Amino acid sequence: MGMTIIDVEESMIPQLAALEEQCFSMPWTEQQLRSQLPDASHEFIAAVDGGRVLGYVGMMFVLDEGYISNVAVSPECRRQGIGDALIAEMDSRAKRRALSFATLEVRESNAPAIALYSKHGYVPVGTRKNYYDLPRENAILMTKFFTDKEDMHCEDTIL
């Protein structure tokens, strides 16, 4: 078969939770994932191949802002364009929703993820000190703007 990107379905939750376990020191549980899925202020997409979830992204929406809450790709599937395709698709959906911008946090030490987000136009805008546990580490806050700054009329706004 081949990889396709689809909306996450309830039946995929156990696979998403397993990915969380593989990828993060403080993973979301099945219950946490399940509670977000039916919420209209969240959107989850997955890269799948033959029913197997290879990776997924979750985004939360507040007014015209997006927050990428989850990005996970199976360790054995990394460096194959899956994260790239997922971020591109979520950015496309953010634009269709007319979002002004999207933000995310990433561990300072996660150079591959930082490079991926940078490739897609996310730029560092700040640091969250001691944001992560296990191990304790700062997060880099990254943002992508989907509108021109002139359109936002924010020349007098401190970002």
Task: Locate each region found by the language model.
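Conserved catalytic-core motifs of GNAT/GCN5-like acyltransferases
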Residues: 31, 105, 118, 123-140
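Residue-level recognition of the GNAT/N-acetyltransferase active site
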Residues: 9, 74, 78, 107-109, ...
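C-terminal "cap" of GNAT-fold acetyltransferases
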Residues: 100, 107-111, 130-159
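Acetyl-CoA-dependent GNAT
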Residues: 4-76, 87-89, 93, 97, ...
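Short coil/turn segments at alpha/beta junctions that flank glycine-rich nucleotide-binding fingerprints
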Residues: 80, 97-100
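Conserved phosphate-binding and hydrolysis motifs of nucleotide-dependent enzymes
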Residues: 9, 51, 55, 81-83, ...
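Conserved acetyl-CoA-binding loop-helix of GNAT-fold acetyltransferases
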Residues: 79-92, 115-119
